[in-house]
Each structure stands twice: as C-alpha cells, then as structure tokens.
C-alpha cells in the first residue's frame, strides 16, 4: 500500500483547522496522519492496487482525496474505532464514492489488459 496524501491535503480543513495552523500539538498531528494512512489503506484495499498512478491521476485524485479525508476525519473523531478494532460503518456517501472509483478502476484495468495482451490470430490452415 502506498500513501499519497498528507494531512494538509484537506484533512485538517475538514476537521476545522487551517492548513497553516501551528497550534496543533504533535499528538493530534500524529493521530491525523495515522488516521489518513488507515483511510488510504482501507480505500486502496476496497478498490485495488495493481494500476500504477490510478490514485494520482488527474481524473481520480479529487475523489480519492475526498473519500480518504472523509474516512480519516471519521477515524479522528471516533478514535475507539481504530484502537479497539471495532467495526466502523462506512457511510453511504463514502460507499458511493468507493463504488465510483471501483468502476473507474475496473474500466482502466480492462483497458490496460487489452493493450498489454496481443490478440491471437488463428492459423489460416485451421
């Protein structure tokens, strides 16, 4: 799993902090970073990791960033969900965005497979 996002990519703002806010203590910054890593891991696990540059493409990065920040914010606001291993219900919007990214991922994977595999021609003698 590769991490692509930092807490300044929208997570701080979604939790009510400014990106340039220096009043955050290291504990909260670490909690945000850990939550973001967990969110990215969840999202990538739900979608796939075979396609290089899928999550950083111009088309997909905004949705990927949005869903990861929403999930990470939920983790920060409900820390028991991470530490106790309790099941966290992913809301309908998060599920919908993950579903949309899954569709894009499947299409891109299909397109890439079509380019990577040469079509086999039948022998005219057959």
Where are these regions (language model features)?
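Conserved short "hinge" loops at termini or chain/domain junctions
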Residues: 1-60, 104-126
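Short loop/turn elements at secondary-structure junctions
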Residues: 56-126
């Amino acid at each position: 799993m590769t991490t692509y996002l930092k807490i300044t990519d929208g997570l701080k703002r979604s939790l009510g902090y400014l990106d340039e806010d220096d009043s955050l203590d290291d504990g909260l910054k670490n909690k945000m970073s850990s939550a973001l890593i967990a969110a990215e891991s969840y999202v990538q696990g739900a979608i796939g990791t075979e396609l290089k540059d899928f999550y950083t493409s111009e088309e997909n990065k905004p949705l990927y960033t949005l869903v990861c920040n929403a999930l990470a914010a939920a983790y920060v606001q409900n820390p028991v969900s991470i530490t106790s291993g309790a099941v966290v219900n992913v809301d309908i919007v998060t599920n919908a965005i993950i579903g949309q990214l899954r569709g894009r991922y499947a299409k891109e994977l299909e397109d890439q497979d079509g380019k990577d595999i040469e079509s086999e021609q039948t022998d005219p003698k057959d």
